[in-house]
């Protein structure tokens, strides 16, 4: 009985934790891909936006993140680069619209079409 109660408790904690993490799907108009955003602190100045291949074994495509100070971009090669010394240009009321635009810009810069 105690094991069952512990299992239920940890399941609830996990569900509540995931709900508080607040993953949001942003507009991303690329077939079979999705853009997921979540905040990680600093009054929403720490955040991660990740482009994933929907329903894929290796879903990672790109990531843009702010650590409350600098802006980082990681492409499908897995190399993380500092792309701005601060996140001010994105941490505005239009953040959810600006993030997809910036990811597309960085993808074309670091992964130009062949």
What kind of feature is each model-predicted range?
Residues 6-15:
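Bacterial N-terminal signal peptides
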Residues 19-63:
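N-terminal secretory signal peptides
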